Amino acid sequence: MKYFVVFCVLIIAVAAFTSAAEDGEVFEENPLEFPKTIQKRCISARYPCSNSKDCCSGNCGTFWTCYIRKDPCSKECLAP
């Protein structure tokens, strides 16, 4: 029974991340510039991206930050 509960929680978590990713947009032509406060946080967090295109390109973000959008650097990123 407890494994079933853990399984259900995991399914809900995956669904939440998926729906969060669908709310964003991919910026190809005109990448959205992050506000200066977020840029500073990105640089200090080893992800020196200044816009969403840099972050999504993998130059600064990783799978875990850009695709799951846990990091402020990937705030506007979406998986391609």
Swiss-Prot record:
Subcellular location: Secreted
Keyword entries, A-Z: Cleavage on pair of basic residues, Disulfide bond, Knottin, Secreted, Signal, Toxin
Signal peptide: 1-20
Membrane-traversing stretches: none
Propeptide: 21-41
Cystine connections: 42-56, 49-60, 55-77, 66-73
Chief location bin: secreted
GO function terms (MF aspect): toxin activity
GO terms for cellular component: extracellular region
Tissue-wise expression: Expressed by the venom gland.
Coiled coil stretches, renumbered: none
Pfam families: Toxin_21
Domain comment in the entry: The presence of a 'disulfide through disulfide knot' structurally defines this protein as a knottin.
Family recorded in the similarity comment: Belongs to the neurotoxin 13 (insecticidal toxin ABC) family. 02 (Calisoga) subfamily.
Function: Causes paralysis to insect larvae (H.virescens). This toxin is active only on insects.
UniProt protein name: U1-nemetoxin-Csp1a
Originating species: Calisoga sp. (Spider)
High-level lineage: Eukaryota, Metazoa, Ecdysozoa, Arthropoda, Chelicerata
